[in-house]
Amino acid sequence: ALACAPAFAGDSLALDPVSIWLGGYYANTEVNVDAKTHDPDVSTGKVQLEEGDDTVGRARLDLLLFGTQGLQFDYYTLSHSSTQTLSAPFSYLGAPFEANTSLRGKFEFAAGTAAYHWWFGDATDAFGVGLGGAYYRAKLKLEGTVALNDQSASGSQKWDEDAVAPLVTIAWRHAFNDSLRFYIEGSGIWKSGGNLSGHLYDGRAGVEWFPWHNVGLAAEYGETRLKLDREGDTYDANLDIKLHGPSLFARFRF
C-alpha cells in the first residue's frame, strides 16, 4: 500500500527548490482608450493607439517550502508608443484634440506580484494554486494639436496612477524527465474602487529544457488582458490592453 501512495509535490521532477527566470516577452500590443466626463457620464471619444510589437522585460523567482508549499514572485514592465492621425475629434482629460491631426500616445505599465502556493502531485506532475497580492502602476500620455478659443495649439495630457490588488494563480507542471518539462500557468488580478481599478488576466504555456543540470532555457507563448478604469475628479478613462506573443527565458535552478 505504501508503494502505491502518491509522492509529495516536493519529490516531483516538475519542481525545483529554487527556480529563477530572466527573459523577455515579445508581445503584440493593442491599447484602446475610452475617455469620458466623470459627472455626468458622457463619452468624449475613443482612440486606439497603433498596434505594434514590444519587448516586455520579465523576471520570476519560485521558492519551494516544506516540500508542498512555496513562494512565487513575478515582475514585468511594458512601454508602448505610437503616432497616428485622428479620424475624429477626441477630448482627453479636457484637452480637445482636433481631427485630421497627429496624435502621439505613450502607455507604460509595470506589475509586481507575490503569491503563496500550495502544490499537489506525484513524481512527474505538480498542480498548484496560489493566493497573493499585486502592485501595479499605469501611465498614459497623449500629445497633439488641440483647439482653444477657435485657435490651434500644441497640447498634452497625462496621468500616473498605481494600486494594490489581490491575486489568484493556478499552475500545472509535467516533467518528461529531469531535463525536459512542460507547464501551463494562469493568474488573475481584481481591483474595485480607488483611482485605478480593473482586472488583469494572464495565461501562458511553455517548455523548459536543461542541457545542464542547473542552467537551461524556457520558451513559452502567453496572452495578457488588462482592463483598467482610471477615475479622476472631472474626467475618467477606460483602457483595454491586449498582449500576446512568445517569451524566451534563461533558466537557473538549484
Q: Which residue stretches match the model-derived regions?
A:
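N-terminal signal peptide c-region/cleavage motif recognized by signal peptidases
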Residues: C4-A9
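Short glycine/proline- and aromatic-enriched beta-strand/turn motifs that initiate or cap beta-hairpins
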Residues: G10-H80, S247, R251-R253
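Residues on the lipid-exposed face of transmembrane beta-strands in outer-membrane beta-barrel proteins
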Residues: L22, A59-L63, A114-W118, L131-G133, ...
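Transmembrane beta-barrel strands of outer-membrane/channel proteins
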Residues: L22-Y26, F73-T77, V129-Y135, W172, ...
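Extracellular/periplasm-exposed beta-strand and loop segments of Gram-negative cell-envelope proteins
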Residues: E30-V56, T77-A110, Y136-A163, K191-N195, ...
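Transmembrane beta-barrel architecture of outer membranes
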Residues: V56, A163-T169, G198-G206, G216, ...
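Repeated loop/turn-to-beta-strand initiation elements of outer-membrane beta-barrel proteins
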Residues: T68-L71, T124-F127, D178-F182, H213-L217
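Glycine/small-residue-rich hydrophobic helix-like segments
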Residues: G194-R230
